[in-house]
Amino acid sequence: MLDSPHNPGSENAAPHDVVIVGGGLAGGLIALALHRHAPDCRFMLIEAGRTLGGHHRWSWFETDIRPAARGLMAGFDLNGWDEGYDITFPSLGRTLPTAYRSLASAEFHAKLIAELPAERVMLETKAASLDAGGVTLADGTRLAAKRVIDCRPFKPSKALSGGWQVFLGQQFRCETPHGLTRPVIMD
């Protein structure tokens, strides 16, 4: 998504192969994949907030990530239930066998900060504009790049249509054991 006109002069001095704007789940995982699988790639991850991943809990079915791509999640402190999950409705419930995973943003941030080179992550740095040749930061600094990936939060656009699911993940610490062995998914 272009925020400003392309600056053709920036291509000649592109110190970055890729600049990723937005350090949420998508941006953080892209940076991690580049670090692990393209070690010569000169990338920069820019996040406006103090932490990567914000304040979220991401949960997914094991089958949501194809087997060949699951290695990207290696090393994250995941909650996981291999025996499946329970679903409940007002008058019925059942157990489904698909493994379920969950990751808190604090663990996401900790893992990325521990693994990504410090010089490749900019926290508390706001991007003022993006174009095909790089990113201009709020302080006026220009980061020239061969490629820019916009991973900032979704903004409504007439050019896009679709829907999404709203997810509320809650984690409770109980004074006494609750006896649950699987997560409960409620629709």
Model-identified regions with their sequence ranges:
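N-terminal FAD cofactor-binding segment of flavoenzymes
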Residues: 33-37, 43-91
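N-terminal Rossmann-like FAD-binding beta1-loop-alpha1 element of flavoenzymes
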Residues: 9-45
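Short beta-strand to alpha-helix junction loop
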Residues: 94-114, 151, 172
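Predominantly flavin-linked oxidoreductase catalytic cores and closely associated redox partners
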Residues: 37, 119-187
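Short glycine-/acidic-enriched loop or helix-start segments at secondary-structure transitions
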Residues: 30-31, 55, 158-161
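Long, hydrophobic/aromatic-enriched structural stretches that serve as scaffold segments
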Residues: 86, 101-105, 123, 133-134
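A short, compositionally biased domain-edge/stem linker segment
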Residues: 1-9
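Glycine-rich nucleotide phosphate-binding loop and flanking beta-alpha elements
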Residues: 27, 52, 155-157
